[in-house]
Amino acid sequence: MGGQEYAISHWPDTEEILAKLDRLVKLPMRPIKRQQMANYLEHFETACNQSKQLNEEARKYIPGGVQHNLAFNYPFPIAVSKAQGPYLWDVDGNRYIDFLQAGGPTLLGNNYPAVQEKVSELVRECAPVTGLFHEYELKLAKLINSHMPSVELFRMLGSGTESVMAAIRAARTFTDKARIVKVGGAYHGWSDQMVYGLHIPGTGAMEAFGIPSGCLKGTDEVFPNDIDSPKGLRALLEKNQKKGGTAAVIVEPLGPESGTRPVTRDYNRRVREACDEFDALLIFDEVVTGFRVGLGGAQGYFSVKPDLTVFGKCVAGGYPAAGGLGGRRDIMACLSAGLETGKPRAYVGGTLSATPLSCAAGYYSILEIEKTKAYIKAGRAGDRVSNGLQGIIKRYGLPYVAFNHGSICHLETSGAMLLDIMAPNALAEAGPRKQMMEEMGAAFTAEGIITLAGSRLYTSMADTDEVIDAALQGFDRVFRNIENA
């Protein structure tokens, strides 16, 4: 780990967690009691009426009534009016503990004053965007390199999706190979080539509506933690080698969906070894883990050096246009900007890439993360949340599963995203389990806790013991009203 500190205080027993998750999906569901769920839904009607009215009007002008997947709340989206520290407030004046954290970027807490002041100052003096070079592009690139030596060159982009697109294009340009291998269930944005094996391993192109099949011809999928089986990573790389080879393997280093399906402690090392054996590049998608796991990222924690690293979220500290790609100098040279000709160049662009605003926000956010050791504080908060949830689950004899990797916490109650797609009853169970997951998320919200889909929680430096204790009391009120087995 190179002497750096990291948010993950201990690596959880992956085999034990996977066994518990497997047991969860095999057992009958344990949803909230119907009368209590009706009470929660009534709460939304009375306490969140302005949010409901806004959403009803928004549906006339916005597809589905919201612009962001994270906002698809049941029974309707909550309209936020204010964010500060560990809290969110809605338009009805209700306060919530924010464990969504905008999907992970606000490690310092919402609207962190020191960063806000620097960004506001820059916008007043310069502009949010100019289309020309600004010194913060250099400052941010140097700062990232100082913490992640594998990032010899860094290119700021507009989002995690764009950054994955750039990584794939650079890998193919550099290697002159076509095939990309991803892990089933992992999320790497919504570009044509990555809408494959989403959420649940083995689903392939099931969600690839509107994407021509030819776009996915170069994308392969392997199951998480499977290196050496006849259908594992090594076998796939060997098969591809006979047909021109593999350009790159892309992984979320904690496991698919930010560790929802956790990988073993040595998984990334073994993937690195397989890539080296079959001459494929290794891409770490650190959109979530970058700076949240520690200043050295997941690559520093695991002591595994990727060839390319994808950034997002924390790289702009919760401000817009958060994306980036970094890595080996020779590979990144394929992304050189400008009008240079005479050598293969992977084309990328973006009007709002590397704006003064996003680069300054990223630079000062990372400085504050370094100064405050926000990743350690958020990691301790994550430990406290996870341990507390485990205690509540045990107290009420529930089959639910809670675990964490530092400040990235998982709470599986329905197992909706853990189904085996090949199981005979998978499709029949998917709908009811998804409904239960949505109901759990609604119950948590009614108790003043915002989560990601009722199953993932991001903690921040702002989450004090007092905040976490209040949240655990809310979870306790939900879990004491669960249907009997």
Where are these regions (language model features)?
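Conserved N-terminal phosphate-binding loop of PLP-dependent enzymes in the Aspartate aminotransferase
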Residues: G2-A485
